[in-house]
């Protein structure tokens, strides 16, 4: 355990620490502007803790020192990039490794991955096909689950406050588990069991390992190990069941099983995808509905598009593709919420950004939360304005950051479709309304969420 680890208190601190733990440190500041270590042993960890989150620390750092900044995590140099221009200089569009996946694997202490370029290309293609095929095969299921939620909300009186975050997490768990892992999760008790174990694992990989508390608390450690073991056991059974057999329902795991992967790679990849997809889908659904409740004009425009595309007919995969404004709503949701505020890459070889040399084996952070609120790139950055994505150059910029197009992570692509179907079903029948006086505070972690429950009300359109 790193000697400075006890000071880490947030998920993202744990995330950065896990990556740094795996690689040698660079001790050169390389003349990059930034702050010197607050403490010799702990670097700028106290500053990050005092800021409340890594994202908020980076916002302040980039405001003070510009687009390329440096700080110290323990005795290790970290460089952060905070504008579109400098990110474009560093992002390699041909790079096949997914930093989100890499960091989660580090936290779970998984060892596979890091293969050759051809192997990584093959795995990326498997992921893409897995998402496409599972969404196509399970569209009717996704529609059914969306309509079940609609029926539940239609039964509420207009004055009833709906716990949005809770309902979206439940919806995401039910839809993702069945589409990724199959019919086992038609049983609500299996979904509840998965959600409980998922919550334990997701929480502990963020706080328990790096602050040392997990090893010191045997009860918590056993709970974590039991939860992870149960998740892995379920996945192993599903993988075994799906091997060498044909099913009418194609699930995400089928694509991995049919690829040239060993059992451990299939287990790890399906675990990462399951963990990440549930959270990203739940939070994207939550934030999209939150923003719609506070923007009557956007909700009206989305309703008109849904009516125009579907009319009185059913929601179909072909017509879903025509929802251009809905796509813009989701892109603007990701941008405004700063859904994934930080990403990272390890500097493989010495590189140059602007006039600054970045030493080899430096951890380079992509301060996406900073970039997505940069007024030089996004006019009126704090305004929820899906119309900004009518501009093709704006969409191209967004895609270059990995939030759409060929560079988006598969979990986000999956979440986009699930959320699109849900909104198509809900907005057609319901007005989504905010609760008067509610202030939603943001909690910045690996995936951004509301600090407390987000409440809404609904009323019938007809």
Swiss-Prot record:
It holds the Pfam family p450. Its EC number is 1.14.-.-. The chain crosses the membrane at residues 4-24. Its main location: membrane. It is found in: Membrane. It is a single-pass membrane protein. Keywords: Heme, Iron, Membrane, Metal-binding, Monooxygenase, Oxidoreductase, Transmembrane, Transmembrane helix. Heme binds at residue 409. GO terms for cellular component: membrane. The keyword Cytoplasm does not apply. GO terms for molecular function: heme binding; iron ion binding; monooxygenase activity; oxidoreductase activity, acting on paired donors, with incorporation or reduction of molecular oxygen. Its cofactor is heme. Belongs to the cytochrome P450 family. This is Cytochrome P450 20A1. It comes from Homo sapiens.
